[in-house]
Amino acid sequence: MSELRALIFDVDGTLAETERDAHRPAFNQAFLEAGLDWEWSVELYGELLEIGGGKERIRHYVQQYQSDFPIPNQDLDQFVITLHEIKNKYFGQLVVDRIPLRPGVMRLIQEAKREGVRLAIATTSDPHNVEALLKSAIAPDGPSWFEVIAAGDMVRVKKPEPDVYQYALQALSLQPEDCLAIEDSHQGLLAAQAAGLKTVITVNNYTRNQDFSGAELVLNSLGEPDEPFTVLSGNVGEATYFDLALARQLHQRG
């Protein structure tokens, strides 16, 4: 078995609670600016999260929930692009100094940097949104902490397809067995598994009841020394928080 050489993180819901606290409010603010009377409730947004990608989510919503909506110039593609650009503007404003990292994320990232374990991101989120979050929640140079940021439309098909993970692996010049993925959702788990990656799940309010069959671990968070995680599935031995030692143990398991 090869050594653990890289951690590949999802972003939304994994690094931070951005789905609940930034993306959904940003969509609703974009709808207001566009003069639309749409509002995505917490419950509805949970359903829409089954669709990977913001633009794809808007398109699905229009087709499934607003089928009688008069699309400007009958150009759905351009309507979706424009609305998503407005949403991204609001997202960037919302994350500045407002969205903290989830427990254990900064500690694990810093430990990986110290020990020479490479860091990458694999997400359906727009690259500008990822950059805004990393700069605000990690450090002004946060994006540079990650050797590869595979995001948004860099790949043709989004999660649950494996394309974004395959892109990250190729950019790292690593094999799946060299890496561990950290995700928060069923869709993300399917993508990572299809790319051949062992995966750790940290659930959130939107995803805690999803099917995580095949994950190495399912946790409520990565935890901290003074804020132990809750193990929902898997074997952590005596560990009370997720660190590189535990990551390496999982990586070595057959």
Region locations from a protein language model:
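Asp-based, Mg2+/Mn2+-dependent phosphohydrolase catalytic module
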Residues: 2-3, 110, 126-254
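N-terminal helical cap/lid subdomain that shapes the substrate entry/recognition surface
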Residues: 2-11, 15-103, 110, 114-115
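Conserved phosphate-coupling serine/threonine residues in phosphotransfer and NTP-handling enzymes
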Residues: 14, 123-125
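Non-catalytic, surface-exposed connector residues within folded enzymatic/regulatory domains
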Residues: 21, 39, 74, 99, ...
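A structural preference for short, pocket-lining loop segments at secondary-structure junctions
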Residues: 117-119
